[in-house]
């Protein structure tokens, strides 16, 4: 529960008259309202009250600020707005006021008139129109719920679900306090605009009934409400209360001045706070302070007013100027911030674009790096294989070079030996030729011829053996050379294979040539012998013994002759002599 509003005014003429009390018993409860001021001389027949109304979501109660039925003169401390005195009364309590008294009465009708000049002629109370009035609202809803405020806990709440709107006045003129109340109650209000019924609520008790109507006006200056309260089963006493409102309600000028001063200070503090925050974010004071000070506050204050009113107007003008400065400051700050936010948004967009481009470049470079790493790994593997193959080929080349050098040395030695053999052969042939010449000069006969043939055959056989050895050596060297070429040609491909085959064929061809040469030499020798034998004079018949030397490791030769004996292959040779008898016949 919170305080809804202050309902408190001051009168130009206030006194220390004992406060009278307005007693209400609509639902067996009493609310007391008092108001007192101790600054002006007392005025006769006037009732003063000071109240505070608390409103909440469930109920609304009234708090009296002055002690009930106080006879003492209130001090200025107690008349201030901070002084409070909450008074509650039991429903059984009954207060008697010589001025105003509202007791239980039968339900009656509430009369509202538009004429403010009308006066109710009552012997008890005369109500005149005063310019200062106020509105008091008493709202009670759901009284079963316990109040939330610590000031109201433990107090007696009002039963029922009634909403009561009551309007009282500040000044009531007391005519005659000794007379009784008339059983009719009327309330006259001055309503500027047409009244409008807002809300009405009904509440019934087992032994009584009561109807309460809430009426208010649309005028923002004053609100006019009248209530008829009262009902009692045992008492039929009626009292008449006439409430008339004619002027607008006014607040305390001191409270209003303090409020304006507080608002001016808060507005100035807000402006300085905004300026400080603006300087923190990089703005300058000269850019946002208004330089137009031509408007003079004093010239705007009308003359003929009190100093208090002038001070209030000055506060209002200062607050207006400070509000304009704060507004310009906020607008310029927001424009600068909007511009900076635009720049930051553009920078952020460019940075995001750069980020996306860099991410794309990074992904592309990562793929390139992976491909480069794979390529580098394959190149390293190939390089390792090539280095290994190069080492193997270099070792093979080194071995082949060594073999080539050794073969060259051997070939040079063989050539040198071959030259020596050829030189020996020429010497032997020369010697043979000389011997033949000597033999031909000395003697001619079959024995000599046989001797010469034997020597010639011996030398021929020696030459053949030498040639065969030389051929074998040459073949061996050629085979080694071919093997070397084979090893070299394995790396060169099919061309080397053809070259190797060509070398083999050339070697075979050379062997065949050498064999043909030997056979041709033997054939030429045989022809020469036959020719020489034909040139000699014949005597009857001559027997020629041809001696040939065969190797006996061929058993197939036994098929040709009956007397052939097989000799196992070995290093020994056997000479077969064939005698041939020639008979020469002469023609007659």
UniProtKB/Swiss-Prot annotation:
Predominant place of localization: other
Top-rank lineage group of the source organism: Eukaryota
Annotated coiled-coil segments of the chain: 332-442, 502-530
Keyword set, alphabetical order: Actin-binding, Cell junction, Coiled coil, Tight junction
Gene Ontology CC: actin filament; adherens junction; bicellular tight junction
Family annotation (Pfam families): POF1B_HlH (PF24617)
Presence of keyword Repressor: no
Localisation per UniProt entry: Cell junction, Tight junction
Keyword Secreted attributed: no
GO molecular function: actin filament binding
GO annotation, biological process: actin filament organization; bicellular tight junction assembly; epithelial cell morphogenesis
Complex formation: Interacts with nonmuscle actin.
PANTHER family: PREMATURE OVARIAN FAILURE, 1B, PROTEIN POF1B
Function: Plays a key role in the organization of epithelial monolayers by regulating the actin cytoskeleton. May be involved in ovary development.
Protein name, entry field: Protein POF1B
Lineage, highest ranks first: Eukaryota, Metazoa, Chordata, Craniata, Vertebrata
Gene this chain is encoded by: POF1B
């Amino acid at each position: 529960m919170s305080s809804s509003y202050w309902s408190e005014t001051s009168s130009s003429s206030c006194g220390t008259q004992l406060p009278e009390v307005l007693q209400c018993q609509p639902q067996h409860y009493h609310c007391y309202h008092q108001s007192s001021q101790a600054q002006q001389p007392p005025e006769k027949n006037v009732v003063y009250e000071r109240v505070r109304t608390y409103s909440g979501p469930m109920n609304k109660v009234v708090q009296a600020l002055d002690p009930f039925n106080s006879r003492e003169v209130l001090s200025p401390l107690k008349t201030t707005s901070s002084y409070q005195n909450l008074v509650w009364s039991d429903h059984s309590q009954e207060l008697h006021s010589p001025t105003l008294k509202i007791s239980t009465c039968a339900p009656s009708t509430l009369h509202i008139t538009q004429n403010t000049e009308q006066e109710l002629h009552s012997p008890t109370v005369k109500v005149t129109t005063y310019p200062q009035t106020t509105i008091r609202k008493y709202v009670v809803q759901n009284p079963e719920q316990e109040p939330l405020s610590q000031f109201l806990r433990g107090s007696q709440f009002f039963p029922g679900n009634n909403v009561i709107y009551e309007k009282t006045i500040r000044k009531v003129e007391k005519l005659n306090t000794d007379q009784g109340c008339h059983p009719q109650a009327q309330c006259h209000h001055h309503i500027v605009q047409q009244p409008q019924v807002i809300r009405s609520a009904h509440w019934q008790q087992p032994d009584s009934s009561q109807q309460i109507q809430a009426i208010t006006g649309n005028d923002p200056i004053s609100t006019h409400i009248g209530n008829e309260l009262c009902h009692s089963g045992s008492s039929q006493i009626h009292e008449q209360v006439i409430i008339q409102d004619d002027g607008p309600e006014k607040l305390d000028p001191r409270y209003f001045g303090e409020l304006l001063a507080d608002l001016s200070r808060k507005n100035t503090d807000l402006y300085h706070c905004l300026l400080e925050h603006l300087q923190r974010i990089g703005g300058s004071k000269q850019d946002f302070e208004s330089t137009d000070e031509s408007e003079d506050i004093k010239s705007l204050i009308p003359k003929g007013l009190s100093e208090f009113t002038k001070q209030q107007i000055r506060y209002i003008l200062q607050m207006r100027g400070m509000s304009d400065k704060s507004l310009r400051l906020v607008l310029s700050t927001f424009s600068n911030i909007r511009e900076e936010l635009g720049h930051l948004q553009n920078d952020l967009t460019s940075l995001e674009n750069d980020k996306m481009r860099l991410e794309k470049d990074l992904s592309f470079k990562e793929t390139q790096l992976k491909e480069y790493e794979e390529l580098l790994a394959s190149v390293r593997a190939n390089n390792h294989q090539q280095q290994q193959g190069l080492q193997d080929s270099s070792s093979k080349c080194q071995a082949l070079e060594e073999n080539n050098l050794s073969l060259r040395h051997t070939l040079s030695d063989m050539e040198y030996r071959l030259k020596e053999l050829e030189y020996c052969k020429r010497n032997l042939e020369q010697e043979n030729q000389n011997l033949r010449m000597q033999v031909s000069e000395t003697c001619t006969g079959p024995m000599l011829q046989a001797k010469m043939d034997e020597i010639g055959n011996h030398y021929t056989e020696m030459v053949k053996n030498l040639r065969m050895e030389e051929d074998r050596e040459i073949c061996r060297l050629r085979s080694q050379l071919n093997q070397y070429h084979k090893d070299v040609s394995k790396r060169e491909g099919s061309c080397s294979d053809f070259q190797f085959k060509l070398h083999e064929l050339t070697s075979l061809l050379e062997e065949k040539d050498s064999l043909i040469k030997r056979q041709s030499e033997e054939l030429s020798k045989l022809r020469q012998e036959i020719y020489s034998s034909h040139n000699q004079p014949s005597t009857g018949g001559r027997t020629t013994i041809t001696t040939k030397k065969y190797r006996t490791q061929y058993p197939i030769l036994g098929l040709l002759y009956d007397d052939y004996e097989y000799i196992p292959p070995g290093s020994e040779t056997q000479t077969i002599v064939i005698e041939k008898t020639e008979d020469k016949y002469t023609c007659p």
